[in-house]
């Protein structure tokens, strides 16, 4: 069973005289920074000149520096910028300011695990990865609660890296809920797998396949949209709150019987594909592909996104959502 840490397992004292630099001020960045400061810790923000987030961070009362200056001033440097830009920022801004007294921190293990960032051996490296979006991390903290997180140690040069990691987790409120010990390898590989085969790639492929099957069989696209996409939220919310068995408790017997008998057909086809995809992740094949795709300017990435934007399910959904005044109309672009 996993090792789980709570408030009583961590002490903020080890960070009391430290300066923590948060690189980035997006969803996670602002939540970490505000929570750490409210926990009594000294936080500064690192953002490039011209970043649209600089004024927001200043308005929230933080001292804002360039990433290099923040790295110079800080004892702990937390990377909360996109994975794809971290290696360049590390090489150009952070690495020149590193010494054995500093600690590198991450919220995702991709660049450490796949060696896009290779820190000096005398530097502590840890990960604290909340299992929820930044706005939830912040909201739960202000309510006196917390969002669960993962914690991992990559390098413990000082002998106190784990204490610092748990203190950081406590500072953002995660130990109120529970912090699960893992490794950079496990967090990275399971995170990529979940995104590709279940949460993002799996769900969107299942929606499109179901929608296309009904439309190709002569059913109205609008009806197919409701059955294969819109109603998914109802089921996911039940699973999220009560688990699979709890969801089944809340649906009709007809739906339940179809679930346990026909769902097995999907399982048998998909599981071997999932196993192959996991193997690609474990061997580093996906990482190499994605790194090269970025270096080439993302031609495949943009082409596939554009293809899916033109899918009929998107066109139908755009019109049907106009019939639903209860949906938020927030502009995502």
Curated annotation (Swiss-Prot):
<feature type="binding site">
    <location>
        <position position="134"/>
    </location>
    <ligand>
        <name>NADP(+)</name>
    </ligand>
</feature>
<feature type="active site">
    <location>
        <position position="108"/>
    </location>
</feature>
<dbReference type="InterPro" id="IPR013023">
    <property type="entry name" value="KARI"/>
</dbReference>
<dbReference type="GO" id="GO:0050661">
    <property type="term" value="F:NADP binding"/>
</dbReference>
<feature type="binding site">
    <location>
        <position position="191"/>
    </location>
    <ligand>
        <name>Mg(2+) 1</name>
    </ligand>
</feature>
<dbReference type="Pfam" id="PF01450">
    <property type="entry name" value="KARI_C"/>
</dbReference>
<feature type="domain" description="KARI C-terminal knotted">
    <location>
        <begin position="183"/>
        <end position="327"/>
    </location>
</feature>
<comment type="pathway">
    <text>Amino-acid biosynthesis; L-isoleucine biosynthesis; L-isoleucine from 2-oxobutanoate: step 2/4.</text>
</comment>
<dbReference type="InterPro" id="IPR000506">
    <property type="entry name" value="KARI_C"/>
</dbReference>
<keyword id="KW-0560">Oxidoreductase</keyword>
<feature type="binding site">
    <location>
        <begin position="83"/>
        <end position="86"/>
    </location>
    <ligand>
        <name>NADP(+)</name>
    </ligand>
</feature>
<comment type="function">
    <text>Involved in the biosynthesis of branched-chain amino acids (BCAA). Catalyzes an alkyl-migration followed by a ketol-acid reduction of (S)-2-acetolactate (S2AL) to yield (R)-2,3-dihydroxy-isovalerate. In the isomerase reaction, S2AL is rearranged via a Mg-dependent methyl migration to produce 3-hydroxy-3-methyl-2-ketobutyrate (HMKB). In the reductase reaction, this 2-ketoacid undergoes a metal-dependent reduction by NADPH to yield (R)-2,3-dihydroxy-isovalerate.</text>
</comment>
<dbReference type="InterPro" id="IPR014359">
    <property type="entry name" value="KARI_prok"/>
</dbReference>
<dbReference type="GO" id="GO:0005829">
    <property type="term" value="C:cytosol"/>
</dbReference>
<dbReference type="InterPro" id="IPR008927">
    <property type="entry name" value="6-PGluconate_DH-like_C_sf"/>
</dbReference>
<keyword id="KW-0479">Metal-binding</keyword>
<feature type="binding site">
    <location>
        <position position="51"/>
    </location>
    <ligand>
        <name>NADP(+)</name>
    </ligand>
</feature>
<keyword id="KW-0460">Magnesium</keyword>
<dbReference type="GO" id="GO:0004455">
    <property type="term" value="F:ketol-acid reductoisomerase activity"/>
</dbReference>
<comment type="pathway">
    <text>Amino-acid biosynthesis; L-valine biosynthesis; L-valine from pyruvate: step 2/4.</text>
</comment>
<feature type="binding site">
    <location>
        <begin position="25"/>
        <end position="28"/>
    </location>
    <ligand>
        <name>NADP(+)</name>
    </ligand>
</feature>
<feature type="binding site">
    <location>
        <position position="231"/>
    </location>
    <ligand>
        <name>Mg(2+) 2</name>
    </ligand>
</feature>
<keyword id="KW-0100">Branched-chain amino acid biosynthesis</keyword>
<dbReference type="GO" id="GO:0009097">
    <property type="term" value="P:isoleucine biosynthetic process"/>
</dbReference>
<dbReference type="GO" id="GO:0000287">
    <property type="term" value="F:magnesium ion binding"/>
</dbReference>
<dbReference type="Pfam" id="PF07991">
    <property type="entry name" value="KARI_N"/>
</dbReference>
<feature type="binding site">
    <location>
        <position position="53"/>
    </location>
    <ligand>
        <name>NADP(+)</name>
    </ligand>
</feature>
<protein>
    <recommendedName>
        <fullName>Ketol-acid reductoisomerase (NADP(+))</fullName>
        <ecNumber>1.1.1.86</ecNumber>
    </recommendedName>
</protein>
<keyword id="KW-0028">Amino-acid biosynthesis</keyword>
<feature type="domain" description="KARI N-terminal Rossmann">
    <location>
        <begin position="2"/>
        <end position="182"/>
    </location>
</feature>
<keyword id="KW-0521">NADP</keyword>
<feature type="binding site">
    <location>
        <position position="252"/>
    </location>
    <ligand>
        <name>substrate</name>
    </ligand>
</feature>
<dbReference type="InterPro" id="IPR036291">
    <property type="entry name" value="NAD(P)-bd_dom_sf"/>
</dbReference>
<dbReference type="InterPro" id="IPR013116">
    <property type="entry name" value="KARI_N"/>
</dbReference>
<feature type="binding site">
    <location>
        <position position="191"/>
    </location>
    <ligand>
        <name>Mg(2+) 2</name>
    </ligand>
</feature>
<feature type="binding site">
    <location>
        <position position="195"/>
    </location>
    <ligand>
        <name>Mg(2+) 1</name>
    </ligand>
</feature>
<comment type="similarity">
    <text>Belongs to the ketol-acid reductoisomerase family.</text>
</comment>
<feature type="binding site">
    <location>
        <position position="227"/>
    </location>
    <ligand>
        <name>Mg(2+) 2</name>
    </ligand>
</feature>
<dbReference type="GO" id="GO:0009099">
    <property type="term" value="P:L-valine biosynthetic process"/>
</dbReference>
């Amino acid at each position: 069973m996993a090792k789980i840490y709570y408030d009583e397992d961590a002490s903020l004292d080890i960070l009391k005289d430290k300066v923590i630099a948060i690189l980035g001020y997006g969803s996670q960045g602002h939540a970490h920074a505000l929570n750490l400061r409210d926990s009594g810790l000294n936080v500064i923000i690192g953002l490039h000149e011209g970043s649209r987030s600089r004024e927001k961070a200043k308005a929230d009362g933080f001292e804002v520096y360039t990433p290099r200056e923040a790295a110079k001033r800080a004892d702990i440097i937390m990377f909360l910028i996109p994975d794809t830009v971290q290696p360049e920022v590390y090489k150009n801004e952070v690495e020149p300011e590193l010494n054995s007294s500093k600690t590198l921190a991450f919220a995702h293990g991709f660049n450490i695990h796949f060696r896009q960032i290779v820190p000096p051996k005398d530097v502590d490296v840890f990960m604290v990865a909340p299992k929820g979006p930044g706005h939830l991390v912040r909201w739960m903290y202000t309510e006196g609660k917390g969002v669960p997180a993962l914690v991992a140690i990559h390098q413990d040069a000082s002998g106190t890296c784990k204490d610092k990691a748990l203190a950081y987790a406590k500072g953002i409120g995660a130990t109120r809920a529970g912090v699960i010990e893992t490794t950079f390898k496990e967090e990275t590989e399971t995170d990529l797998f979940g995104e590709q085969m279940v949460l993002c790639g799996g769900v969107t492929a299942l929606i499109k396949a179901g929608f296309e099957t009904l439309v190709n069989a002569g059913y109205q696209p609008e009806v197919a949209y409701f059955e294969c996409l819109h109603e998914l939220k109802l089921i996911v919310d039940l699973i999220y709150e009560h688990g699979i068995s709890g969801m089944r408790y809340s649906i009709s017997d007809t739906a339940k019987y179809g679930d346990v008998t026909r769902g097995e057909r999907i399982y048998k086809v998909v599981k071997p594909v999932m196993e192959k995809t996991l193997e690609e992740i474990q061997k580093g094949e996906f990482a190499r592909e994605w790194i090269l795709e970025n270096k080439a300017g993302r031609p495949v990435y943009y082409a596939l996104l554009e293809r899916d934007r033109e899918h009929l399910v998107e066109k139908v959904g755009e019109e049907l959502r106009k019939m639903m005044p209860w949906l938020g109309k927030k502009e995502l672009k």
